[in-house]
Amino acid sequence: MLTERQLLIFRAIIDHFTWTIQPVGSKNLLKEKGLPYSSATIRNEMGVLEEYGFIEKTHSSSGRVPSEKGYRFYVDYLLQPKKLDKSDRQMIRSFFSENYYEMEGLIQNSALMLSDLTNYTSILLGPEATKNHLSGFRFVPINNFQAMLILITDQGHVDNHLVTIPEGTTLSDIERMVNILNERLVGLSLDDLKVQIPMEVKELLGKHVRNYESFMHVFSDSFAQASQQKVYFGGKTNILNQPEFHDINKVREMLHLMEEEQDVYELFRDIPDGLQVKIGRENNNSLMEDCSIITATYNIAGERVGGIVLLGPTRMEYSRMMGLVDVMSRDLTDVLTKLYRDNQN
C-alpha cells in the first residue's frame, strides 16, 4: 500500500511524536532524522500519507501527527513485539525468581512491576472468583471480643475478616464450629456458598454450638466478599500524568472509574486471548479515547484464569510495551502454574 519511501517517512513521524509529543513538518523531520530525501519530497509524501488518513493536521500547528488509523496500520503491519533489552529482562527474571507462596500477592506485585517498567497504568484481572472452591477456614482469636476469620480457596486466595465474637460464645464453641464448617463446606464453590449455607450444616451447628446463629451473617459476608472479582492495579494514576490528560473533568471521571473495581473488571473481562491492541476510539469508552490499551491473558495449568491490561497514551512505544505485556503473560502463567501444582501436592 505504501512505498518504501513513504514507510520510512511514516515511521519517522511516529518516532518523532512518540518522544516529543509535538507535530512535525518536513523541514524538521529532515533535520531531526537525516532522511535521504529533500524537504520538498518529504512534504509531498506527507501529503500522500495525509490523504490516506495515516497522519493529520492539528489545530495548533502546521505540522502533522499520526492519526488513529495510522497507528492501527503501524501496529498491524509494521512492527512486532520488541525483544526486551537486558535491563527489562533482568528485572522481570529477578522478580519471577523470588519464592511466592500465594497467588494474590504474586498477581498484585506483577501489576506493580509492569507499571514500574512502563510508567503507565497496569491492571491485572484476578481469576474468576465464583469458580473458586473453599479449601479451608481458620478462626484466630485476637482477644475476648474479636477474632480473625481466614477463608482460603483452592486457587490460593486468602480472605481475612476481623469479626466480633458474639457475647456468650466460648473458644470451645468457635473450635467446634470451625471443625464442622471445614468438614462440611470444604470443596463447595463460593458461588453456591454466597447464596446460602446448606441447611444440614446449620442444623448440625445448632446441635453442637451455642449462639451459632450470631455467626451466620459473618460467614455469609465472608463468602460474598470472597466471591467478588479481584482487580489489581499498578500505577493507578500514572496514565493521568500523561500530557494528553489535561481535561480536569476527564481526569476526575477516570479516577472515579479506577476506584470502582467491579466496573473495571466488567470493562475488561472479555478481552480475547493472545496479545491485542486497541487504539483510541476503538475502546468504545469516552474516557479512553486518548488511550491505547494492550491486553493479554494468563493461564494456570492450561486454563485461562485472568487478564493483563496496560493503559497508556496512543503515542506509546508500542513495540516495547507489547513485548513487556507478552513476556509478563508467559512468565506469570509459568509461575502461577508451578504455584498451583505445588499447592496440589
Curated annotation (Swiss-Prot):
Keywords: Repressor, Stress response, Transcription, Transcription regulation
Record bears the keyword Nucleotide-binding: no
Top-level division of the source organism's lineage: Bacteria
UniProt GO BP: negative regulation of DNA-templated transcription
Gene Ontology molecular functions: DNA binding
Cross-referenced Pfam families: HrcA (PF01628)
Gene3D superfamilies given in the database record: 3.30.450.40, Heat-inducible transcription repressor hrca homolog, domain 3 (3.30.390.60), Winged helix-like DNA-binding domain superfamily/Winged helix DNA-binding domain (1.10.10.10)
InterPro entries per record: GAF-like_dom_sf (IPR029016), HrcA (IPR002571), HrcA_C (IPR021153), WH-like_DNA-bd_sf (IPR036388), WH_DNA-bd_sf (IPR036390), WHTH_transcript_rep_HrcA_IDD (IPR023120)
Keyword set includes Nucleotide-binding: no
Family (UniProt): Belongs to the HrcA family.
Reported function: Negative regulator of class I heat shock genes (grpE-dnaK-dnaJ and groELS operons). Prevents heat-shock induction of these operons.
Protein name: Heat-inducible transcription repressor HrcA
Annotated source species: Listeria monocytogenes serovar 1/2a (strain ATCC BAA-679 / EGD-e)
Gene: hrcA
